[in-house]
């Protein structure tokens, strides 16, 4: 079990509004990104690994009980979420995603997920795991080690926050915005009620058209990590149709909440260069779309435990 940063969609169930951080990213110590930088038109995953963490008997990162406590989500440990489907959209294949998530769940006493198919996941009354390619089939793309670690992080966090939810992993053929967006549409078509997107890339002039094509799904909660390179906005976090999730540093404390939490300067934030400010944003800091909307633990120095 290793410790990593998290920008998981499930955290948007209940979080506080994030402000804009204009500082440079804080030093990461011995943490490192698991995905390389992306060229124009492509995205990079936003996971980091703490390379100082050893394979100890007990995980050193934050576990499900910590996250439920920190964000007052204890009700989700019961029956909440049963029958609901969270989709994880990432690029490339993680061949061991199903077995890995059940190792994570066993570590924390969470019942294992059953196996189901993409077409049946949304109807399952028993928490189950399904995997599809970007068009809903089961011929998967090639493996990528960095993206596979991101997938482990995302699937583990969905399990931690909503153990009774079904999990649908949709793997895009590549990290292009076109392929990832196609995977988002497929996730919605397969019945997902929440779609997590833990990736991002440089903004581009055609993103207003792309957001309408891939992210405009009324009634579906679509969340996107805001990035992990400090001040600046990425797509698709800039979309008006998503909840952009920023990052914090989270530590246990002796206060009433039991936790202290501060903004993490490595999280992406700022003003979009292209997306019009939506009517539901009333801040005066940006003339266009402001990023981020909510925040959760993301600092690699205070990260979560992940099995990969």
Predicted feature residues:
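Secretory targeting and sorting signals
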Residues: 1-24
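Phosphate/oxyanion-binding loops and surfaces in catalytic or ligand/nucleic-acid-binding neighborhoods
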Residues: 13, 248-252
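Amphipathic, positively biased hydrophobic alpha-helical segments used for protein targeting
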Residues: 19-21, 238-239, 258
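Substrate-binding/charge-relay-adjacent region of secreted/lumenal peptidase catalytic domains
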Residues: 24-247, 269-308
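Predominantly extracellular beta-rich ligand-binding scaffolds that present long acidic/polar faces
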Residues: 252-258
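An alpha-beta-alpha
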Residues: 260-263, 268-270
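Short, surface-exposed amphipathic charged segments that create phosphate/polyanion-binding patches used
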Residues: 184-185, 258-262
């Amino acid at each position: 079990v290793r410790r990593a940063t998290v920008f998981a969609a499930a955290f948007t169930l209940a979080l506080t509004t994030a402000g804009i951080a204009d500082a440079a990213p804080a030093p990461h110590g011995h943490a490192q990104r698991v995905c390389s930088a992306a060229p124009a038109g492509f995205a990079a995953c936003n996971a980091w690994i703490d390379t100082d963490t050893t394979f100890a008997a007990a995980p050193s990162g934050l576990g499900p009980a910590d996250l439920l406590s920190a964000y007052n989500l204890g009700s989700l440990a019961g029956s909440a979420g049963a029958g609901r489907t969270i989709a994880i959209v990432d690029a490339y294949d993680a061949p061991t995603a199903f077995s890995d998530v059940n190792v994570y769940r066993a570590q924390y006493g969470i019942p294992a997920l059953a196996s189901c198919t993409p077409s049946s996941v949304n109807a399952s009354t028993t928490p189950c795991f399904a995997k599809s390619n970007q068009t809903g089939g089961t011929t998967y793309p090639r493996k990528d080690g960095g993206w596979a670690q991101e997938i482990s992080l995302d699937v583990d966090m969905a399990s931690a926050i909503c153990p009774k939810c079904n999990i649908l992993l949709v793997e895009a053929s590549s990290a292009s915005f076109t392929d990832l967006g196609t995977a988002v549409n497929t996730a919605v078509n397969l019945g997902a009620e929440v779609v997590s997107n833990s990736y991002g890339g440089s903004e581009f002039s055609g993103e207003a058209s792309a957001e309408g094509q891939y992210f405009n799904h009324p009634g579906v909660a679509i969340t996107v990590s805001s990035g992990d390179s400090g001040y600046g906005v990425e797509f698709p976090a800039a979309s008006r149709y998503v909840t952009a999730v920023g990052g914090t540093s989270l530590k246990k404390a002796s206060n009433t909440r039991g936790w202290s939490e501060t903004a993490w300067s490595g999280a992406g934030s700022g003003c979009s260069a292209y997306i019009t400010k939506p009517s539901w944003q009333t801040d005066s800091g940006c003339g266009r779309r402001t990023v981020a909307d909510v925040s959760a633990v993301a600092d690699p120095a205070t990260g979560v435990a992940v099995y990969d």
